[in-house]
Structures are given as C-alpha cells and as structure tokens.
Design a protein with these regions (language model features):
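Beta-propeller domain segments
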Residues: 13-15, 23-25, 92-202
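Acidic, Gly/Ser/Thr-rich repeat motifs that build Ca2+-stabilized beta-propeller blades
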Residues: 1-97, 149-164
Length: 202
C-alpha cells in the first residue's frame, strides 16, 4: 500500500484522482489529484511521482497547484486524452461564481502537458488580453459545478459526467472553450447538456 504524504481529508476532500502516464510501462510516472494544506490554506493540487521497482515514490513534482478547495465540490478526475495531454476536472469548491471566473481554476476542465506546461492550442493561450486580465491558460472549458468523470469516444470526443444541484446530474460533450453554464443566472449563452437526469439522479 502506497501512502501519499500531505493529503487532507474533509467531507468530499482528499485523494481524488489518479492517472498513469501514457508511457507508464517505460517511465513509471503517475499523477494524483488531492487536497492538501499549504500555508494554512486548504487547496487542491496535481502532483507527479515515479514508482520504483521497490514500490517507493520518488521524483515528486507539483504539476499544477492553486486549485480552489472546499469541503464540497472538489472535482478531482484526471485522465490523459488521446492527444497526450492531461485533462483535470475541478469543482467550484462550493462557490458557484468561480465556475464563470476565468481567473480561477475552479469549476473548469483544465488541459496541460505531462510536465505541467500550457499546450499551444488551448483556448486561452498567452496574448495581451489574456495576460492583462490574468486569465488561466490551463482552462479548456468552464461553467462546471462538480465534474466527476472524463472519457473519450472512438471519434476522439471528450465527455464528462457532472453532479448537479439536488439531482439534475448531466452528461456533457466537452468542446474547447465551451461554457457549460454553472454560475450563470437567467442566461442561455451556454452549452446544453447532452443528457440530464432532471429531478432524478442516476
């Protein structure tokens, strides 16, 4: 049994996601998403480790930090896409307004390289507007409440499952730069879910 140091647990917080590097058989790298405490503040981060032949953890590297955390809605699913990039589902940390805030990593699906860099074709790559407004370049889509699943179909489309408020769970087809509506009031300028449970839960 591996023990991950520094994991903080509270309600929905804790050790939330695991992904193996696409070349895990050769490089033994894997990634975890977990809640921790840094400088007295609760936060979520993605960390990479290498697994030795003796089942020990080495070469720790923080791939992404500063993901808002709460006792609810921490997201936490991570997976490598067919394009080789790491996708990270984050919850709104029980603060719906953050899902629409492009300066926050909360309530988003993020996309980064295996080293934590920004892919050049992300929707908010570096330019004067992005830099001036402090938009997070890791963002791939936004307006999410608490996405809990990531999967790709045979055509390469990304799908996500998401917890809604009091049921209203949904399945979304994720598109680059898409706004999925959480945190908006009285607006229809967002992408409708592919499927919704309505007042029931699946």
């Amino acid at each position: 049994v591996l023990r991950i140091p520094g994991v903080f647990t509270d309600n929905e917080s804790g050790l939330l996601g695991l992904a193996l590097h696409p070349n895990f058989n050769e490089n033994k790298l894997f990634y975890i998403y977990y809640t921790t405490i840094i400088g007295g503040e609760v936060t979520n981060q993605v960390v990479r480790y290498r697994l030795t032949d003796n089942i020990e953890l080495t070469d720790r590297k923080i791939i992404l930090d500063g993901i808002p955390a709460g006792s609810q809605h921490d997201g936490g699913r991570i997976a490598f896409g067919q394009d080789g990039y790491l996708y990270i589902a984050t919850g709104d940390s029980d603060n719906p307004s953050l899902a629409q805030d492009l300066t926050s990593l909360a309530g988003k699906i993020l996309r980064i390289t295996d080293d934590g860099e920004i892919p050049s074709d992300n929707p908010y790559v570096s330019n004067a507007y992005v830099n001036t407004n402090n938009i997070k370049q890791e963002i791939y889509s936004y307006g999410h409440r608490n996405p809990q699943g990531l999967a790709w179909d045979s055509q390469g489309n990304l799908w996500s499952t998401e917890h809604g408020p009091i049921a209203h769970d949904k399945i979304n087809k994720i598109v680059k730069g898409g706004n999925y509506g959480w945190g908006l009031e009285g607006s229809s300028e967002f992408i409708e879910p592919y499927l919704s449970s309505g007042i029931e839960t699946w």
